[in-house]
Amino acid sequence: MANTYHNDLLAPYLSLDQGDKIQAEYVWIDGDGGLRCKTTTVSKKVTDIGQLRIWDFDGSSTNQAPGHDSDVYLRPAAIFKDPFRGGDNILVLAETYNNDGTPNRTNHRHHAKKVFDEAKEHEPWFGLEQEYTLFDADDQPYGWPKGGFPGPQGPYYCGAGTGKVFARDLIEAHYRACLYAGINISGINAEVMPSQWEFQVGPCEGISMGDHLWMARYLLVRIAEQWGVKVSFHPKPLKGEWNGAGCHTNFSTKAMREAGGMKFIEDAIEKLAKRHDEHIAVYGEDNDLRLTGRHETGHISNFSSGVANRGASIRVPRHVASQGYGYLEDRRPASNIDPYRVTSIIAETTILDK
């Protein structure tokens, strides 16, 4: 399938005067964990989320409602600047609700918000490491030899140079777009498998972690669309001796970040161990293909922890263990997680003692 996006043809129109009106692009999570969007015109610059209307869409076309009762409502939840249109135009992350006012089954933000409201005094911070893999229009890993394979893993992680990294221009575009949009992106790097990359978002407190990661994902797939490239969040996109893709989740509370916080980190690890199976249940589909005990993972059936151990379920960074306070890294979440589910269950387990 050829790339049908014509940036050169579009550019002159994006510079046209909009008058006092702006474009607000609503973005939501569909029934299959993907992202959807549509745009409305707003009569003036938006400075507060309360100025935006509740909108609706055909949920029968997104696997979120039956055809005979298909209206699903979009309630604005967070606003970001629009890096595609510029100016005062905005991106609106929206929650989905059924016509009876209940949250749609795919709306995990609704529950997460309740959890974080309850845990607010503990100031839970998160940082997510989103790994993903790029494919070309023919579903081949981007930049790989046609009908063949690149050399074994080794030179690609944080690599530089032709043959070691692929699509750096796309990755740089995404990084800058996130910064412009107001997403708290904190870094990028090429990953162990060629054509696999990672971006980090955070630290973000509470519900904002999910908001920022979902919008960062949206920007990624939109920019990849312009390049004619596909983005896969599958945790094991290729069989064989290739690393899978995760979404390592860094977590701390106010008590963990203060002097003597190591005790609270150890307490949290004990609590996480007791609910291992419940966490795995929301840590991503097909995660068993990734959590094999190989390729820098712990086995999906076993809980483990250790200092600087990338083969453990929970890793405590060495500098954290040395200084006696900081954060922990949960290495179990897959790349295709819903961040609202992962961050909220961590807060439930470690803070609310659910």
UniProtKB/Swiss-Prot annotation:
Name the record gives this protein: Glutamine synthetase
A Gene Ontology cellular-component term: cytoplasm
Disulfide bonds: none
SMART domains in UniProt: Gln-synt_C
Domain called GS catalytic: residue spans: 108-354
Domain GS beta-grasp: 22-101
Localization, UniProt: Cytoplasm
Source organism per UniProt: Agaricus bisporus
Keyword entries, A-Z: ATP-binding, Cytoplasm, Ligase, Nucleotide-binding
Gene3D superfamilies xref list: Glutamine synthetase, N-terminal domain, Glutamine synthetase/guanido kinase, catalytic domain
EC number, as in UniProt: 6.3.1.2
Assembly description: Homooctamer.
InterPro entries referenced in this protein's UniProt entry, alphabetically: Gln_synt_N, Gln_synt_N_sf, Gln_synth/guanido_kin_cat_dom, Gln_synth_cat_dom, Gln_synth_gly_rich_site, Gln_synth_N_conserv_site, Glutamine_Synthetase
The reaction(s) this protein catalyses: L-glutamate + NH4(+) + ATP = L-glutamine + ADP + phosphate + H(+)
Gene Ontology molecular function, alphabetical: ATP binding; glutamine synthetase activity
Family of the protein in this entry: Belongs to the glutamine synthetase family.
Source superkingdom: Eukaryota
Gene Ontology biological process: glutamine biosynthetic process
